[in-house]
Amino acid sequence: MSNAPEKKNQQNDPSPAVSLNDQMKRRFEERAHLAESGIEPYPYKFDVTATSKGIIERFDEENPEDVSVAGRIMAIRKMGKASFFHIQDSVGRIQIYLKRDEVGVDSYNTFKLLDIGDIVGVKGFSFRTKTGEISVHAKEFELLSKSLRPIPIAKEKEVDGEKVVYDAFADRELRYRQRYVDLIVNPEVRDTFIKRTKIVALMRNYFASNGWLEVETPILQPIYGGAAARPFTTHHNALDMQLYLRIANELYLKRLIVGGFDGVYEFAKDFRNEGIDRFHNPEFTQVELYVAYKDYVWMMELVEDLLHKACVEVNGKDSTMFLGNEINLKPPFRRLTIADSIKEYTGMEIRDKSEAQLRDIAKDLGLELDPKISSGKIIDEIFGEFVEPKLIQPTFITDYPEEMSPLAKKHRSEPGLVERFELIVGGKEVCNSFSELNDPVIQRERLEEQARLRQRGDDEAMIVDEDFLRALEYGMPPCAGLGIGIDRMVMLLTGEDSIRDVIFFPHMKPE
């Protein structure tokens, strides 16, 4: 072992004089030295019998537990005849005590070649150190994976009067581009994604417990629909036809309601060829639910119950912190029509106004509008600019103009409106729901009007889908539909302020 590569302070050297290339060169040399010494730097398996968290939770001073644990080295304190280091596994961290006289000189010298970031397996027993820390006293250890690239941004922390090197990773853009490093060095990031999984599992169980069927519908579609958005296009070579990545799965799920299912839902990847910001990613996750014989009023109550249960599951209480505000998700939520909301926050009355009058209202409010957009889009612009950001506590915005919602059923008592709601929380839309339009004649009229809007230049207007209309002509029962953006819901319940913080690998500009 005397010809081992020279190490700087026996760990990652944080000094600027040591470049990344120098550190990597040394690690490659260590890898080669290990292999030459007959030590496999990447063995095939290691039998794990315990986790860091389990060892700590089960610790009994009187009955030390024999354990076999594995993880990544996150801190090292090397001394002459004994060393301490911390390993991190999928559920936490635990300290390891390694003594030369117990593991043997050769093994101990091998340990001296290890770095922060290396993955090791340890066999030994649990004990408590003099400082009170539950640890593992190693009897054997094995290198499981040699890390050739140092974890970035070293920092020092004093432990028991000695300096210990830790690593951190703070640059947000680098964190998103190299999520694997982010997960290694920022445990709170891992916690966010664990919570995401719990939220989706709760929703899935909630829907299944009601007897509704989880289904799958096409991602590649010959006609896109179900939302107002620009699609991604692709080409099918064998069929020589243009296809679209779905922007929503609504129209296919409604076909299944026509087919006789009382309730269907799908956790779907949807794609919209639009901008990227804190609340939008071109590829996103959405769950859509359709339940026969129900309406949008019933769906509001379901949403209240579902969000409250998810909040309690993740946070252990009725509320969550989101964008600097404490959000109370205990039902009931406030309900407000879109017209009343605009009246309340701008003083302007939009009911029974012509397109020209709506343009004048927008102008008075200081909005500059695209001359091609129609009445529905004008109302949407006014709401989005002056109302939505002010709706912090959960609020159902209801009863939208017909033009804004071509797939929703006309309001049973308010001419010109439809039975639709959006839930706004923290100034952002979380979900969207309709009493679904099931009259095929009116649906055709609505989609043909959308086609006219496309001719006026609205490239987000929907396309006439003849097969969907044919399905409706067979008869679809009364139905309530719901779409929830999973990414935004996770942001809300975990307190994250960017959609990139709840998606493992968000889309980024090229480096």
Curated annotation (Swiss-Prot):
GO terms for cellular component: cytosol. InterPro entries: Aa-tRNA-synt_II (IPR004364), aa-tRNA-synth_II (IPR006195), aa-tRNA-synth_II/BPL/LPL (IPR045864), Lys-tRNA-ligase_II (IPR002313), Lys-tRNA-ligase_II_N (IPR044136), Lys-tRNA-synth_II_C (IPR018149), NA-bd_OB-fold (IPR012340), NA-bd_OB_tRNA (IPR004365). Mg(2+) 2 binds at residue 429. Residues 11-22 have a biased composition (Polar residues). It is an enzyme of class 6 (ligase). Keywords: Aminoacyl-tRNA synthetase, ATP-binding, Cytoplasm, Ligase, Magnesium, Metal-binding, Nucleotide-binding, Protein biosynthesis. It comes from the Bacteria. It is found in: Cytoplasm. The keyword Protein biosynthesis applies. Its cofactor is Mg(2+). Pfam families: tRNA-synt_2, tRNA_anti-codon. Residues 1-10 have a biased composition (Basic and acidic residues). One of its GO terms (molecular function) is tRNA binding. One of its GO terms (biological process) is lysyl-tRNA aminoacylation. Binds 3 Mg(2+) ions per subunit. Mg(2+) 1 binds at residues 422, 429. Homodimer. NCBIfam families: lysS_bact (TIGR00499), PRK00484.1 (NF001756). This is Lysine--tRNA ligase.
